[in-house]
């Protein structure tokens, strides 16, 4: 091998010498006669095998340079000869020899490698509507079917076309946006074997067909000197090949700083933020700032205006004449608009510079963030004549204050003050009204009700002073009795623009003098008829009022009490509880869905709240609102519910308040949404799938037991342990048909349970679940007790269930149709859940923490009977009340462990002070639930964003004495039993 190479070198040297001699014997070539350099071997293509030698010789009279190019990469040599001793696949490419005149010759070399048919250049990019080259040149030109193939056998798009070149690769024609992220291989058949290249993923750069979309965070800013100015420009385009900048109007100098932040949002959406800031704005920074962006298609811009003032301001604009005339008994609204920066912190209306009124609304002129204009409306209703005067609106912020005054005059019908006296031969009529009344006199012979003959000019005096500067004007008019020569009636008539009134005076001649006979106007037949009609009308109104008051009125169930002298208590008026406006949530961020429950005056609607927890997050919530038919009482009740919920705070086992809308529209209360509805119907749905190890059959056992008499029998050896009640329908363990029977009409969420929710809770119900529900409700009630809150309507229908089988105590209030709910019995002026109420609540109208404990015992009976109604088959009548009073209680439900029935019996103790507290109940149930359930609940409580508030120990009992503050009437007096 070495000898062969030496011979080759010798021949190469001889060839060079011959060329030199030939060149020296020929005339030199002029620069204009330069020829192409010649390459040996004289071929356009050369095929070698991997490991072979590549030897290329370039001859030219002058200097030559070799250039090797493959996949866009270049390498150079200045020797006339290019030698590669052991060729590799990567030596495949175009070899070019260039002389000093710039003329060149090329040869393409294929290095055949069975292991490497394709040379690969990644990544693969393509521009929309242009051609793109898939760089996969071949190392062996003698293959067949050189083309593109989809990954994993997937077909290529039907409209994709390409052109194959073994030396360059495969060119895809007219790239489309739909090809983005297309996976493909270069493929070929080499000696009957199908070969694939490495995987290419085509990334398409979208063609720019429109100008960028430009927007700013706010279109105008108003600042005080020294405040920070910060505005963000958002540029949207299909790719990052967009330029952007902030420009100040008139190129004024400013100390503004800019910061850029960009990201891709999807495949063909590019976003860039240009944030402009001035840390301490000055008056001369005021002006117009333009955000400018451009791409290859064109440019776009948007502006924002900055106004910097040296200090804050308030400008008031009355929206009506400041002098207002209104008739007696009518309404008027005093409306002002005002501009204020910074935001106003104090607004007030003052009457006659001494008393304030709160019958006003204040709201922004628009929802725009840049809004500085506000509207304030004072509502004056059914104005009386004495309520005229000055009404001054005061508004202030941290810098200035301002005010505007309205002069309100109340137009009143004239009132005759004096008309039936003769003084020194003069008859006087005194009238008061506004505007100033006019008085006319009329005379008619005899005793008449009205006169038609006017009396000539009379002496009329106007009293300059009035009751108040804005009160009635008093007018005096006198007439000489010598004007009248005969017996008769004199009528005084006073009138103004509002109305008129009159009074008459009767006199008769007696000798040479006149004397008054009587002032007959009060007892005329017309007046008598009017008085009778008015009396009948009053009686009718009183009857209607009585009937209205006898109707069951809505009352907030949850009551907050305050302790006095340690034991006795009174209810706190919920309207006096504070409301923190931090709960306010914008109405326009609520999207309402289906109605979850409805009552006579209110309803609960499923809604989506945007930005309630996070600025860009959507959350499903429940919104309680009033129907248009609601009265003032119901509106106040809903506001009271809101105040009670905000006062209580958050706990995992109550339906927590999330927000509210009280400004600019009807009141909306936003609470947590519980997807599984109320616990009562959940239990009834799960009857068929309930798993319980306790299989005792209670179908043949009496339902009621006289607990009081049973205690006495243990002492007195009495054999009268049970009472033969024989209810109309005996208790039978529910059959499958019974279990499928619809529960209660109007139940919250039951009729709207979606398949998605049902699929999400396919697990069966077991005894551990019932114990967990008992435990959670006791925890929630312990929390309410720690807040001095009495529920008054604790039942399974008022317990909601959400994900993780977490129970939450609620009060449906206005949203429950208690009128059509048989669980609520009409007593007095309320509908009450009698079967869940403690004896002291039924007979003495006493509601305490202990009465809630009784209701909790009834709830446990519902729970462990899987949603059966308490006291089944028994109507609420005098017999029912008598049994409760005599100590009869329900026996253990079908699925209740003995320990849970013991808790029920202690909850139903006739002596309220012997019943356990909710804190003690929690401790009792805690011993029965499994460690895993307790552990899961503890973890949920710790991970919950609403942590439990520390409980207050109610071991010191509040005395079970009814508060005089309670408006609820006793259900049944002792004599009715």
Swiss-Prot record:
GO terms for cellular component: plasma membrane; receptor complex. Residues 27-112, 121-205, 212-309, 318-411, 414-508 form the Ig-like C2-type domain. Residues 569-571 are annotated as: Important for interaction with phosphotyrosine-binding proteins. The keyword Repeat applies. GO terms for biological process: actin cytoskeleton organization; B cell differentiation; cell chemotaxis; cell migration; cytokine-mediated signaling pathway; detection of mechanical stimulus involved in sensory perception of sound; digestive tract development; embryonic hemopoiesis. InterPro entries: Ig-like_dom, Ig-like_dom_sf, Ig-like_fold, Ig_sub, Ig_sub2, Immunoglobulin_dom, Kinase-like_dom_sf, Prot_kinase_dom. Its EC number is 2.7.10.1. It is a single-pass type I membrane protein. Residues 590-938 form the Protein kinase domain. Present in an inactive conformation in the absence of bound ligand. KITLG/SCF binding leads to dimerization and activation by autophosphorylation on tyrosine residues. Activity is down-regulated by PRKCA-mediated phosphorylation on serine residues. SMART domains: IG, IGc2, TyrKc. Mg(2+) binds at residues 569, 798, 811. Residues 26-525 are extracellular. PANTHER family: MAST_STEM CELL GROWTH FACTOR RECEPTOR KIT, TYROSINE-PROTEIN KINASE RECEPTOR. Tyrosine-protein kinase that acts as a cell-surface receptor for the cytokine KITLG/SCF and plays an essential role in the regulation of cell survival and proliferation, hematopoiesis, stem cell maintenance, gametogenesis, mast cell development, migration and function, and in melanogenesis. In response to KITLG/SCF binding, KIT can activate several signaling pathways. Phosphorylates PIK3R1, PLCG1, SH2B2/APS and CBL. Activates the AKT1 signaling pathway by phosphorylation of PIK3R1, the regulatory subunit of phosphatidylinositol 3-kinase. Monomer in the absence of bound KITLG/SCF. Homodimer in the presence of bound KITLG/SCF, forming a heterotetramer with two KITLG/SCF molecules. Interacts (via phosphorylated tyrosine residues) with the adapter proteins GRB2 and GRB7 (via SH2 domain), and SH2B2/APS. Interacts (via C-terminus) with MPDZ (via the tenth PDZ domain). Interacts (via phosphorylated tyrosine residues) with PIK3R1 and PIK3CD. Interacts (via phosphorylated tyrosine) with CRK (isoform Crk-II), FYN, SHC1 and MATK/CHK (via SH2 domain). Interacts with LYN and FES/FPS. Belongs to the protein kinase superfamily. Tyr protein kinase family. CSF-1/PDGF receptor subfamily. Numerous proteins are phosphorylated in response to KIT signaling, but it is not evident to determine which are directly phosphorylated by KIT under in vivo conditions. This is Mast/stem cell growth factor receptor Kit. It comes from Bos taurus. The gene is KIT.
């Amino acid at each position: 091998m070495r000898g062969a190479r030496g011979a080759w070198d010798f021949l190469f040297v001889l060839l060079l010498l011959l060329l030199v001699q030939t060149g020296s014997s020929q005339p030199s070539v002029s620069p204009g006669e330069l020829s192409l350099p010649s390459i040996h071997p004289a071929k356009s293509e050369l095929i070698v095998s991997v490991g072979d030698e590549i030897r290329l010789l370039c001859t030219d009279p002058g200097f030559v340079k070799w250039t090797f190019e493959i996949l866009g990469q270049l390498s150079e040599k200045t020797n006339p000869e290019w030698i590669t001793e052991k060729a590799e696949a990567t030596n495949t490419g175009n070899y070019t020899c260039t002389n000093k005149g710039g003329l060149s010759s090329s040869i393409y070399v294929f290095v055949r490698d069975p292991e490497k048919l394709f040379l690969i250049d990644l990544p693969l990019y393509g521009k929309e509507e242009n051609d793109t080259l898939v760089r996969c040149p071949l190392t062996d030109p003698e293959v067949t079917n050189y083309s593109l193939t989809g990954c994993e056998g997937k077909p290529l798009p039907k409209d994709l076309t390409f052109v194959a070149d073994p030396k360059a690769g495969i060119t895809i024609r007219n790239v489309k946006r739909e090809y983005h992220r297309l996976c493909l291989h270069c493929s070929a058949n080499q000696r009957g074997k199908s070969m694939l290249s490495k995987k290419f993923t085509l990334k398409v750069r979208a063609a720019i067909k429109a100008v960028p979309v430009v927007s700013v965070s706010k279109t105008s800013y108003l600042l005080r000197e020294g405040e920070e100015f910060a505005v963000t420009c958002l540029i949207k385009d299909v790719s990052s090949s967009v330029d952007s900048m902030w420009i100040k109007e008139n190129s004024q100098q400013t100390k503004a700083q800019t910061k850029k932040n960009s990201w891709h949002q999807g495949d063909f959406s590019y976003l860039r933020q240009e944030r402009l800031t001035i840390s301490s704005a000055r008056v001369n920074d005021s002006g117009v700032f333009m955000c400018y962006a451009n791409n290859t298609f064109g440019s776009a811009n948007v502006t924002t205006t900055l106004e910097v003032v040296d200090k804050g301001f308030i400008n008031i604009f009355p929206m009506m004449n400041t002098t207002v005339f209104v008739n007696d008994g009518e309404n008027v609204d005093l409306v002002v608009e005002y501009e204020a920066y910074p935001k106003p912190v104090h607004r007030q209306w003052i009457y006659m510079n001494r008393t304030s009124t709160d019958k006003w609304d204040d709201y922004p002129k628009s929802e725009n963030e840049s809004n500085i204009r506000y509207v304030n409306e004072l509502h004056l209703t059914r104005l009386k004549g004495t309520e005229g005067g000055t009404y001054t609106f005061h508004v202030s912020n941290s810098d200035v204050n301002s005010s505007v005054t309205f002069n309100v005059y109340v137009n009143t019908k004239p009132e005759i003050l004096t008309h039936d006296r003769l003084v020194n031969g003069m008859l006087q009529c005194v009238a008061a009204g506004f505007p100033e009344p006019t008085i006319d006199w009329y005379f008619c012979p005899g005793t008449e009700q009205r006169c038609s003959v006017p009396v000539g000019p009379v002496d009329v005096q106007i009293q300059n002073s009035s009751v108040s500067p804005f009160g009635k004007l008093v007018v005096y008019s006198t007439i000489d009795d010598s004007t009248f020569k005969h017996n008769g009636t004199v009528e005084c008539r006073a009138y103004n623009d509002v109305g008129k009134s009159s009074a008459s005076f009767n006199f008769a001649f007696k000798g040479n003098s006149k004397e008054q006979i009587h002032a007959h106007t009060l007892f005329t037949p017309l007046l008598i008829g009017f008085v009778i009609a008015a009396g009948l009308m009053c009686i009718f109104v009183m009857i209607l009022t009585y009937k209205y008051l006898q109707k069951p009125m809505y009352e907030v169930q949850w009551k907050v009490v305050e302790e006095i002298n340690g034991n006795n208590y009174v209810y706190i008026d919920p309207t006096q509880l504070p409301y923190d406006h931090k709960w306010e949530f914008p109405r326009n961020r609520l999207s309402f869905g289906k109605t979850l429950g409805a009552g006579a005056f209110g309803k609960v609607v499923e809604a989506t709240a945007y930005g309630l927890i996070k600025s860009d997050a959507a959350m499903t919530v429940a919104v309680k609102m009033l129907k248009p038919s609601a009265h003032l009482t119901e509106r106040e009740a809903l506001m009271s519910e809101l105040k009670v919920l905000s006062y209580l705070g958050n706990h995992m086992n109550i339906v927590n308040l999330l927000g509210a809308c009280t400004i600019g529209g009807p009141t909306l209360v936003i609470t947590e949404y519980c997807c599984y509805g109320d616990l009562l119907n959940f239990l009834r749905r799960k009857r068929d799938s309930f798993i319980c190890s306790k299989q005792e059959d209670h179908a043949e056992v009496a339902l009621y037991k006289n607990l009081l008499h049973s205690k006495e029998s243990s002492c007195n050896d009495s054999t009268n342990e049970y009472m033969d009640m024989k209810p109309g329908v005996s208790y039978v363990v529910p059959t499958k048909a019974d279990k499928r029977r619809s529960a209660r009409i109007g139940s919250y969420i039951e009729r709207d349970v979606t398949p998605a929710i049902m699929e999400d809770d396919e697990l069966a119900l077991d005894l551990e679940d019932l114990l967990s529900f008992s435990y959670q409700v006791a925890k929630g009630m312990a929390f309410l007790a720690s807040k001095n809150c009495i529920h008054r309507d604790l039942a399974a229908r008022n317990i909601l269930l959400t994900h993780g089988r977490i129970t939450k105590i609620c009060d449906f209030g206005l949203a429950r149709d208690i009128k059509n709910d048989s669980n609520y019995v009409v007593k007095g002026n309320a509908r009450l859940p009698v079967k869940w109420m403690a004896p002291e609540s039924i007979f003495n109208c006493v509601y305490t923490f202990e009465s809630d404990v009784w209701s909790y015992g009834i709830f446990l009976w519902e729970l462990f009977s899987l949603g059966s109604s308490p006291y089944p088959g028994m109507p609420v009548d005098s017999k029912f009340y008598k049994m409760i009073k005599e100590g009869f209680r329900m026996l253990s439900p079908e699925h209740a462990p003995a320990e849970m029935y013991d808790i029920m019996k202690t909850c139903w103790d006739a002596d309220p002070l012997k019943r356990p507290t909710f804190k003690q109940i929690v401790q009792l149930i805690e011993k029965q639930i499994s460690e895993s359930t307790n552990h899961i609940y503890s973890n949920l409580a710790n991970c919950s964003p609403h942590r439990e508030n520390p409980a207050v120990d109610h071991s010191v009992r509040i005395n079970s004495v009814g508060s005089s503050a309670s408006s609820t009437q006793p259900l049944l007096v002792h004599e009715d039993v």
